[in-house]
Design a protein with these regions (language model features):
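Glycine-rich phosphate-binding loops of nucleotide-dependent enzymes
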Residues: 2-235
Length: 235
């Protein structure tokens, strides 16, 4: 049984237009799965539909064997899924420590053990735990956002464009942290414009175009695909 099964989802931001037009995908236990495609393909919309921010008009979202289609985000979180949006993913006026504490709002059991694990994973955050997040670099803020999502001890982490706007050195650090998160047993579904780097460490990838599935396969296989390389990998 797949950890996540998205089946023929149709969704949009109004009744007239469907951004997603029957998209399907799967994430198995322990996998990293990448979603790539051009701007406007529906990648971020798909994450919102999975997490319950958007209510699908058709199709199903099944998570850990349970149909969660249309459930609100606060319910989806309790079932073991966390989501890091591309923007507004931290509280800039709060400290690093306070941001992480906000992530434990529904799970107080094991709080101190989890926050220590986050600090071991992101040692820079321990050093800056009393600083306001708004004063941190973009890469450090992304670490805070991921750390806060991990405070819920999720089975699946959804990441929307985690490398957006970051310097190249910070991009590599963020990607390495994603790999580390996955090695600790958390499955990851990532939307990423840096398609080449995302596919390098992904077990499977999906290419979306105009709100539909265009292609999918193992990450390394998609890297070698001539059509994918021409359209999305700059080669």
């Amino acid at each position: 049984m797949s950890l996540l099964a998205v089946e023929r989802i149709r969704a949009g931001y109004n009744e007239e237009v469907d951004i997603l037009q029957g998209v399907s995908l799967r994430v198995e236990q322990g996998q990293i799965v990448a979603i790539i495609g051009p701007n406007g393909a529906g990648k971020s919309t798909l994450l919102k539909a999975i997490f319950g921010i958007l209510h699908p008009k058709e199709g199903r979202v099944v998570f850990d064997g349970e149909d969660i289609t249309g459930l609100p985000p606060e319910t989806v979180v309790r079932k073991g899924m966390s989501y890091v949006p591309q923007v507004r993913n931290v509280f800039p006026s709060l400290t690093v420590q306070e941001n992480l504490e906000m992530g434990a709002f529904i799970r107080r059991d094991g709080f101190f053990e989890r926050i220590e694990e986050i600090y071991r994973m992101f040692p820079d955050l321990r050093e800056k735990r009393h600083q306001r997040v708004g004063r941190l670099s973009g890469g450090q803020r992304q670490m805070v956002a991921m750390g806060r999502a991990l405070m819920l001890d999720p089975k699946l982490l959804l990441l929307d464009e985690p490398s957006a706007g970051l310097a190249p050195a910070m991009v590599e650090m963020v990607f390495e942290k994603i790999r580390e998160i996955n090695r600790r047993g958390v499955a990851v579904l990532i939307v990423e414009q840096n398609a080449k780097e995302a596919l390098k460490f992904s077990d499977h990838g999906y290419v979306l175009a105009m709100g539909r599935n265009a292609l999918d396969g193992p990450g390394q296989e998609l890297l070698r695909n001539e059509e994918v390389a021409k359209l999305y990998l700059g080669g």
